[in-house]
Amino acid sequence: MPSTPLSAAVEALSEDAAQARHAELSRAIERANQLYYNEDAPELTDAEYDALRQELEAIEARFPALTGTTEASAGVGAKPSEKFAKVRHAVPMLSLGNAFADEDVDEFVARVRRFLNLPAEESVAFTAEPKIDGLSLSLRYEAGRLVTAATRGDGEVGENVTANALTVDDIPETLSGENIPEVLEVRGEVYLSHEDFAAINARQEAAGKPLFANPRNAAAGSLRQLDPAITASRPLRFFAYAWGEVSEPFTDTQSAVLERFRGWGLPVNPRTKLCRSAEEMIAHYRTIEAERAGLGYDIDGVVYKVDDLGFQRRLGFVSRAPRWALAHKFAAQEAITELLAIDINVGRTGSLNPLARLKPVTVGGVVVSNATLHNEGYVQGVGADGEPIREGRDIRVGDTVIVVRAGDVIPKVRDVVIEKRPADAVPYVFPDTCPACGSRAVRELNPRTKKLDAIRRCTGGLICPAQGVERLKHFVSRNGFDLEGFGQTYIEVLFEAGLVKQPADLFRLEFEPLKAAIVARRETLSAQRRSEGEPAPKKPTKKKGEEEDKAIKNLLASLDARRTIPLNRFLFALGIPQIGESTAKALAKRFPDMPSLMAALEAATREQAGRDWLELSALPRIGPGTRDRLFETLDPLPGEAMQDLSLGARLRGRLTPSQREAVLAHYGSEEKVDAALERAASQRPGDAYRLFADDGEIGPVATDSLIQFFSEPHNDAAVRALLEEVGTEPLATTTSAAAFAGKTVVFTGSLEKMTRSEAKATAERLGAKVSGSVSAKTDLVVAGPGAGSKLKDAEKHGVKVVSEDDWLAMLAEA
C-alpha cells in the first residue's frame, strides 16, 4: 500500500514522541467521547474525530506496546451517564475500524482473505450499507416482545432507555412473523430526518430554547430524555443492522439476517447491497456518496461486512473492533477563518496545551470557535520528530487558518494561508512558566532523537494546582477509586481549602473541617453573587442543614468503603501516563500487591537502558529491531572468531553496508562508531527491566513511564502515604477458559486447520500469551508438520507439546 502523509509522519516518530502524541490523542478522544456520547454536545465533526482515531491507531500499529494503555485505545464510546439505570450488554457493542481511501478497502479485503487462508478461486461476499450518523441502540426482545432498550455506553454497559424507545414509531414493541428466536438482541441506529430536524429546531426557536447543532445531537438528546413524553414529541426513526445475543442461530449470512429483520417488522436500510469484490464495494460507496445530499438523513460513510457468518466467527475481533467489518468514511470538511488568540491550559500530566480561539465559522453544519493546536512544536511548524511540518510555516495570532473537522472531537488548525498573514503578525512565544503555578515549563531533550520534545511541560508536579486537581479528579473517578459523591466540585473545594493535596489526604478527612470547607465555599459564592447585584440566597433551614450533614457523612462513608481496592484500579487511579485500564490489569495479573510491584520497578530502574543504547535505535536504517538483533550475542560469530577484532569492530561488521553508512555519518569515524557500539553494549537493559518491557501487555513505553513516575521522590512518597491509608487486593479473575488464562503458548510448524493469525487470536482471546520463542517459562507448544528447533527447545525445558488436533480439542473444552 502506498505511503501516506500520516503513515510517513508516524514512521518518523521516536518512541518518546509517539508516547507523548498517543497520550495527547487519547485525551482528545476521551474528551470527545464524553461530549459525544454522554453530553450530546460534540466539539468536533466526525471527520476530525476519525482523523484523531486514525492517527492513534497508526501510532499503535508501529508501537504495539501503546495499544490498550488508555481508555481511548482500549474502550468504545464513553461511560454511561449516571442519569439512567445501567444495562450490561450480553454481547459488547463494539466500534468499527475505519477506511479513508480506496486502498484501505483493497487492503481490508486482502487482509480478510489472508486471515482465512482462502485459495484464489474462492470468493468472499460483503454487504455494503450506508453508515447512519445517529445514536447506537440495542433492543432486547424476549418471546418477540421488547423488554429492554439500551444505548451503547462504553460498549460493555449502556443506559436503559426502554420507555423512550417504545415511543419511536419505527421500533416495534412486538415482532411479527415466523421463527423468531426466544431471545434476540437487535442493534441499530436512532436518527432524525433533515425535515424533522428542521421542524424540531423551529419549535425550539419559537420557545426561546437553544437550537440543536445537528440531527445527530438532536436524536441523541431526544432519546436520552428523562421524560419519555419529550421523546415521543420528536419523530425519531430507526434502522436495524446487527444483533447481539440470540438464543439460537437463525441464518448463516449477514444479508439473510437483514431479510429476517425486515420480515419481523424491523426497518432495514434499503440501500444495502451485496458485493463480491473490493471494486464492487468501492463502486457502491461512490453511488452512496453521490446520493448523500438527497437521502434526507445524515450518513458519514459506508459499512462493509463479511457476509458469511461462519467467516465472521473465524475472523473474530481485535481490540475494540471486529476483523470482519470496516467503515469507509467520507472525507473531512474544512473552513477558513481568523485566529483571534492562543490560550494555554495545563493538562493533568503537566503539558502546556495551546488552544486556538477562532472567529466563529461553520464547518460541516456546526459552528466552531475553538480548535486544538496540539503542542508548542506544532505551533512552530515542527513535528514530534523535530522535522518541519506545513513546510515549516508557524502559526501566529491574526493568521488566516484552515480549520478541519474530522469527527466529533475538538477541531484542529490544519494550516495557515500564508498569503493573508498580516504584516504585524509576530511568532507566538510560549510561556516559560506554568500559567497555573508559576513553576518552570520546559521542553526536555529526547534521548532517543537528540531533539527537543514537541510538548512543553510544567515541572511543578504535585504542587501545581492544575495537575493536582486533575489528578485528584481522575483518582476519584468511576474507573479509579470510584468514590461516590466526590464530584469535580468537591475536589476543587477541598483542594482550594488545603484539605486535600494528594490522594492520601482524602482518607484523612474529618467531619468538621470538611463541613467548614463546604460552608466557606458557599459563603464565597454568595458574596460574589451579591457583588454582581444578584439577590442573596436564603439562609439554610434546619432541615437543609441536617441534609447537608447527612451528605457529608455519606462522603466519609464512601471513603471508608474504599479502604480496600483491587490492585488494577489502584494503579489506574494514580494517573500515571501510559497506564490505562488495560496496562493496569496486566500489571495486576503479574504482581500480587504494590510493594512487590514497586520492588520490581526499583530493580528495573537500576537495569534500565543507557543513553547510547537508546540513541542507536533513533539512527536512520537502524531502529529497535536491528539494534536488538545486533547485540543478541557479544561472543564472536563463526566468521569473526578467526579475526583479532575489538567488540566494537565486530559489532560494526555485522551491520549492512547502508547501516554502516548511517552510523558513520552520525558518529563521524569508525573509531567513534566502535566506541559508541561498545558503550551501547554495556548499557543494554537487564532482565529486571525486560521483565516489564518485553511483556506484550506492558511494553517499553509504559515501563519507562512507570520508572519515571516512581523515580520522582514526591510521587513515591505520595503512593507510600496512600498505602498507609488503604490496602489492595489481587485482581479478580474469571473462571472461564481457566486452562489458558495467563499461560504462555508457542506455535511452531505448519498449522493445517487454522491460520497462524487465527490460532494466535484464539489463544489471546482465552487469556493466553503467545510467544515466538520457547523458554523455561513456556507452558505449551503447539506443533504442526515441519516443527524444528522449537521442538528441541521444548524437550530441553520439559515443556508440554501437543498437536494441532490436540489444541483444537482443548479449545472445544474451554
UniProtKB/Swiss-Prot annotation:
**Family the UniProt entry places it in:** Belongs to the NAD-dependent DNA ligase family. LigA subfamily.
Q: What is this protein called?
A: DNA ligase
* Enzyme class (EC, first level): ligase
The residues that the entry says bind NAD(+) are: D46, A47, E48, Y49, D50, S95, L96, E129, R152, E189, K305, K329
The lineage's top-level taxon is Bacteria
Q: Where is the BRCT domain?
A: 735-814
Asked whether the keyword Ribonucleoprotein is assigned, the reply is no
Write down a Pfam family by its short name. Answer: BRCT
Which organism is the protein's source? Methylorubrum extorquens (strain PA1)
Provide the gene name from the record: ligA
